[in-house]
């Protein structure tokens, strides 16, 4: 079996996905964001303004900036006692992506999240996606997964989606 590395020391992965990667969806204009391996790429972000109150970005950063909000949802749907992969992901996930849309807020433009696997050696990635839409909120989220290198990747991803009454997530 391959020996997979895990980026526990949070070494920087040298890539600017906005310069080297295109994931075009025909006839759709999106707000484009990236997760490189397991880390939200925040060195360059779309210029578009999100509606007031919307939180979008690194799960790690948002858990530090809004701990009460993240604690309210993180790990509430992902049952680690019944699923070994979910338990593994929960133990090793260090970052990922979070989208929070407050009550009644509508994000007009679709959000495109591209998960990129990038490494020079066999690599293991555990990332988490957390999406929360409060009552009456609306968003469209397109998630794409791509590998940039010709090495073996072992990836786990757990997605938790909370959609309150009358909210819409496409």
Q: Language model features by range: what are they?
A:
Residues 1-170:
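Glycine-rich and polybasic anion-binding loops at the starts of cofactor/ligand-binding domains
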